[in-house]
Amino acid sequence: MTLAIDMVGTNLGSGTRTYNTNFCEYLEKKTFNEKIYIFITKNYKADTNTQRDNIKYIIKPNFLTNIFFRVVWMQFFLPFELKKLKVDKLYSPMNFGPVFLKLFKINFVLALHSNLPWVYFSKMPGNIIRNKLTKFMMEKSILACDSLIVDSHFAKNEIVSMMNIKKDKVFVIYLGVDQKYLSPKENNYFLNNFDYKDYIISILSCVRYHNIINILKAFKLFKKDNNNTRLVFVLQILDKKYFLEIKKYVDNNFFHGEIIFLNGLDNKYLVNLYKNANLFVFSSYCEVFGLTSLEAMAQNCPVAISNTTALPEINGNAAHYFDPDNIKDIKESLRILIANKEYTKTLILKGNNHFKKFNWEKTVLETCHVLELN
């Protein structure tokens, strides 16, 4: 069998990039005989370093990360490239793929990492045309694929219900914690002019469904009794309009230095930001997995998190939960994790055992089973 993997939609700094870089790294460690072609963009090639004769990277121009160009290439050019390479199966871990592969007699396996278009369409970043195109392509790809991989049982149940597809077509494969959070070596990457004490951290994309303003409202209440604590956001800004709303709220409600934004930060600094934080908070409305809470657990950082969607499934009893719409509940969660040292210590111990259940070697092994790689 000849397999192709389409990773052309990968953007620098995106969660999909985390998936794809780890997938490639662990795939190259696995023994198999099949020929594999991996389609990637130029700015992504630096993250790959294969020494395998049976794995070949096919480099595509960076402009294909734009969804409009990507759709055209994927639907009208990629199938012919696959046919020319005599590919038997395509794996697309990018939420959608070519919808006419059956005409080319090519098996299609899709991985879905989002349910946003169906449950929180109005909170998606980007313009409405882009978002409608994304939803349309995801729906058509789900119906067209031969097998579908999702990140949680919550995601499987939701997709099966919304799209009316057969359960036995859908496989649940959990993601893993990135190796940089697991290394026993001491991490020496520290930010200049940053005080690594008395702060709460939230690492997330700046999008409306991540509910950042509710964190700020809760923190404003929390500050009345915890004046020295700061709130630090490490953001990837995907919705500029929403970020301006956040900045306006901060300017009107907080003194200078109480809220810190670290935008577009290199991932190498995250280990020590997690490790030295008083706690990690994540108030998302909608997740089919969510890696950052597990990363926090790996650095002995207690986690306060939304009680919605897949988050309870993924974090189990190793996190403290709150209602993301209830400002007082979020505030009380922050207070408890700061004030109740014994409870926080128990959460840290649970988290330290819990995150170890999620590793990329297992993710790749289970995916290879679905792909029938021997």
Regions inferred by a protein language model and the residue ranges of each:
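Short hydrophobic beta-strand element within catalytic cores of glycosyltransferases
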Residues: 298, 302-305
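Short alpha-helical donor nucleotide-sugar binding micro-motif in glycosyltransferases
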Residues: 82, 272-277
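Glycosyltransferase donor-sugar binding loop
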Residues: 38-44, 177, 230-245, 263
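Nucleotide-activated donor-binding/catalytic signature segment of Leloir-type glycosyltransferases, i.e.
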Residues: 244-268
